[in-house]
């Protein structure tokens, strides 16, 4: 087996894949669903419903607020309670639509059957129609970045797509939602990949999976041979070394096709690759073949102190508390609640934060694990430099961010940081490297945007 990986940096944190074998359960409907209007990169969605309106499962409740945006659909049936603000996964109050749940009535246009729909059975499908279906269904990147999928399939004239790479790496500790999705919905994922290749007008596809998911590698390799042998598509399952952050977009492109994505504003399609999460491929299948907009997703609920950790198919808008309760409740003592995993997840201030399009995990870290050690002076060991998958100097970026030298930070390429946390994980002095770099990167990007707007 030819095992590939990226060329610079990387670490190997403890996996803690506690729910690896936990078959996906369908989460119970919430009593009240909360839909933030910013569930994607770009402009927030605009409400198209009002207080008192009746909605069904699959009803559009907010339309795209601009070109880089995505519509939002109700995952429940019921009555719009109010349009208000609530704390979302960012920790800030953001506009939301709140719906009181009444029954489970779906829009009639959605195909709820288990029949596998193939591309061959739909000869009328064109690249333009596929992209339009994806756009209208509100499909975004399901790996956490939440970039509208249709935009990736329509690159600028200066870039030419050569392949689609499915990101099935799931290198973040604890999270197993993508693994369970692959084991349970392999056929649908491959049809989703086929649709993505059609939409991008390419015939080459790759599925990158880390070697700690051998059952998924074996299953998808077998399914690919059955589906694509003799077809015009060349699809390969690529086994990848267990190495964090193997699932980073640039690291995945490096590992799979040995091409380096330049610094921002360059994106993978500038070197010929369109990267989509495996959950996105499944959402594309459902959007195009089942006329089902994006309103539910596979999510892991996990933590060493969680009584019954598991994987769930959960309707968006469901409060995290409902999922934690379904797993036995919040453990006693002090805990840290994360939307996502321990490396790149966001710490939350409330268990009422709802599941959104990008929520791949609800992770509960116990007080002992969560407590940071007291930062010590830098010992100049350069471990952070060796760990950085972007070839940056984290100790330097953190220091110049701390003293607010934004011009120097931009010169040192702070905007190339992918915020993976490898530097902070490996630092023996427990320096808050990522904290400072993240703040510095945000400030520098704001300065760059402001400068561009004046031109």
Which residues make up each language-model segment?
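N-terminal, Lys/Arg-enriched amphipathic/low-complexity engagement segments
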Residues: 1-48
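Conserved hydrophobic positions within beta-strands
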Residues: 78-80
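Hydrophobic alpha-helical positions that pack around
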Residues: 203-320, 326-331, 341
């Amino acid at each position: 087996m030819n095992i590939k990986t990226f060329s610079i940096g990387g670490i190997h944190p403890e996996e803690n894949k506690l729910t690896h074998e936990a078959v996906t359960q369908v989460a119970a409907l919430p009593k009240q669903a909360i839909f933030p209007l910013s569930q994607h990169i770009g402009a927030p969605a605009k409400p198209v419903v009002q207080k008192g309106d009746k909605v069904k499962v699959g009803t559009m409740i907010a339309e795209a607020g601009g070109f880089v945006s995505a519509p939002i659909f109700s995952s429940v049936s019921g009555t719009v309670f109010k349009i208000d603000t609530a704390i979302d996964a960012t920790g800030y109050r953001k506009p939301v639509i709140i719906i009181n749940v009444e029954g489970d009535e779906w829009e009639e246009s959605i195909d709820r059957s288990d029949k596998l729909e193939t591309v061959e059975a739909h000869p009328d499908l064109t690249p333009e129609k596929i992209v339009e279906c994806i756009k209208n269904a509100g499909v975004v990147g399901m790996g956490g970045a939440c970039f509208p999928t249709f935009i990736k399939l329509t690159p600028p004239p200066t870039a030419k797509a050569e392949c689609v790479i499915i990101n099935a790496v799931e290198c973040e500790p604890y999270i197993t939602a993508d693994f369970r999705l692959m084991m349970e919905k392999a056929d649908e994922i491959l049809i989703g990949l086929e649709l993505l290749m059609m939409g991008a007008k390419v015939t080459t596809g790759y599925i990158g999976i880390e070697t700690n998911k051998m059952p998924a590698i074996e299953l998808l390799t077998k399914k690919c041979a059955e589906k694509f042998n003799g077809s015009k598509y060349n699809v390969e399952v690529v086994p990848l070394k267990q190495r964090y952050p193997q699932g980073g977009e640039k690291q995945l492109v490096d590992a799979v096709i040995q091409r380096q994505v330049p610094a921002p504003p360059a994106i993978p399609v500038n070197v010929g690759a369109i990267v989509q999460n495996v959950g996105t491929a499944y959402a594309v299948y459902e959007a195009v073949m089942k006329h089902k907009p994006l309103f539910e997703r596979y999510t892991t609920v996990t933590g060493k102190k969680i009584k019954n950790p598991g994987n769930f198919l959960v309707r968006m808008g469901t409060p995290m508390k409902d999922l934690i309760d379904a797993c036995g409740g919040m453990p006693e003592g002090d805990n840290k609640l994360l939307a996502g995993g321990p490396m790149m997840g966001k710490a939350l201030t409330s268990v009422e934060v709802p599941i959104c399009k990008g929520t791949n995990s609800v992770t509960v870290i116990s007080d002992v694990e969560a407590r940071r050690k007291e930062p010590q002076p830098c010992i100049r060991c350069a471990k952070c430099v060796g760990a950085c998958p972007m070839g940056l100097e984290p100790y330097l970026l953190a220091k110049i961010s701390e003293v607010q030298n934004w011009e120097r930070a931009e010169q040192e390429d702070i905007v190339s940081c992918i915020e993976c946390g490898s530097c902070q994980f490996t630092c023996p002095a427990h320096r808050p490297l990522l904290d400072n770099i993240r703040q510095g990167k945000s400030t520098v990007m704001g300065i760059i945007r402001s400068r561009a707007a004046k031109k």
